[in-house]
Amino acid sequence: MGQFTLTPSEQEIQAFLKQYKKYLSSSKNPYIRYFFRLEQATASVYTSGKLLLQGEEADKYALFFKETADLTRPPQKITYQAMIGTDEVGNGSYFGGLAVVASFVTKEQEDFLRKLGVGDSKTLTDQKIRQLAPILKEKITHQALLLSPKKYNQVIASGYNAVSVKVALHNQAIYLLLEKGIKPDQIVIDAFTSSTNYQRYVKQERNQVSQAIHLEEKAEGKYLAVAVSSIIARDLFLENLEILSQELGYQLPSGAGAKSDQVASQILKAYGMAGLETSAKLHFKNTQKAKQLLER
C-alpha cells in the first residue's frame, strides 16, 4: 500500500477539494479537516495543514500535488533526434487486460505522424484509433505488451499492486525495444506514479533499463512517441475487450462504472467467479458490487 505525507498550500487543497468533491466523506477524527474516500485510496487533510494519502492508487493522487510530491521533472526543454515514449491503456477499466506500448519515433517521422492525425488517444474516437493503429504498427518501431485479465489477477495475487505491475510492464516494453538495437536520445513515460516509486519498484525487475527515464504528466499530448504508444495501446485494449466479449457472450464495457457492475453480475450468474477471473480485474470494487447486485 502506498503512503505519502505532503504539505500542500491552501490553494492546492482547495483545488483538490474542487476536483474530488464527490469523494468527500466524514471522519470522527477532530484533527481531520477534510476526508476523501477515493478510488483505491484515501486522503486526509489535517488541521495542521498536512495531507496523508494512503492506498494502492495513492501515487496517482500524489501527482496532483507535483510541487510537493517530489515527482521527477524533465528538463525545461527536452531536445532530441529520436525518442522512446510509452503509455498504457486499460488500468482504469474493470474489464479487459492492461496494454503497454513503447514506441521509437525520430524527428524525420514527425511530419508524417502529424499529417496522419496522430494525437492523444483520449481525444480520438475508437473508430479513428482502429484506423490509425494498423498504419502505426507497420511504420513505427514499437514493442506492445498485453497482460490478460487472467494473468493480471495472477500477478496481483503474487504480490504486485496496481502501480508495480505497470512499472514492470513499462520497463519490459522499453527493455525489449532497446534490445532491437535502437538508440534513443530520450525515454519518456506518461507519468502514472512518482519517480521515487518507479525506481523502487523497477529494482525488483530482472531486466532493468540503464538509460535515464523521464516521467512526465500528460506526455501523450506533448510527444508524438508517447501519442503513438497511446493509440496502439488503446487499439490493443479494444481488441482484447472485443475477444473477451465474444467468448462470454456479453458486451463488456470499458471503464469501471455502474454498467460494469451490471454486466459483471450477469457474468457471475452465468459462469460464477471463473467468468470474471478471465475477463476482469478482480481487485476493483466492481467485483463486490456485482456480488451485491446478484444477491438482491
Curated annotation (Swiss-Prot):
Main location: cytoplasm
Listed GO CC annotations: cytoplasm; ribonuclease H2 complex
GO biological process: DNA replication, removal of RNA primer; mismatch repair
Annotated RNase H type-2 domain residues: 81-296
Keyword Cytoplasm: yes
Domain of life: Bacteria
EC identifiers of the protein: 3.1.26.4
Cofactor note: Manganese or magnesium. Binds 1 divalent metal ion per monomer in the absence of substrate. May bind a second metal ion after substrate binding.
A Pfam short name: DUF3378
InterPro entries per record: RNase_HII/HIII, RNase_HII/HIII_dom, RNase_HIII, RNase_HIII_N, RNaseH-like_sf, RNaseH_sf, TBP_dom_sf
Keyword Protease: no
Cofactor requirements of the protein: Mn(2+); Mg(2+)
Keyword annotations: Cytoplasm, Endonuclease, Hydrolase, Magnesium, Metal-binding, Nuclease
GO MF term list: magnesium ion binding; RNA binding; RNA-DNA hybrid ribonuclease activity
Localization in the cell: Cytoplasm
Binding site for a divalent metal cation: D87, E88, D190
Catalysis: reaction(s): Endonucleolytic cleavage to 5'-phosphomonoester
Family per record: Belongs to the RNase HII family. RnhC subfamily.
Chain's role: Endonuclease that specifically degrades the RNA of RNA-DNA hybrids.
The protein, known as: Ribonuclease HIII
Lineage per the UniProt record: Bacteria, Bacillati, Bacillota, Bacilli, Lactobacillales
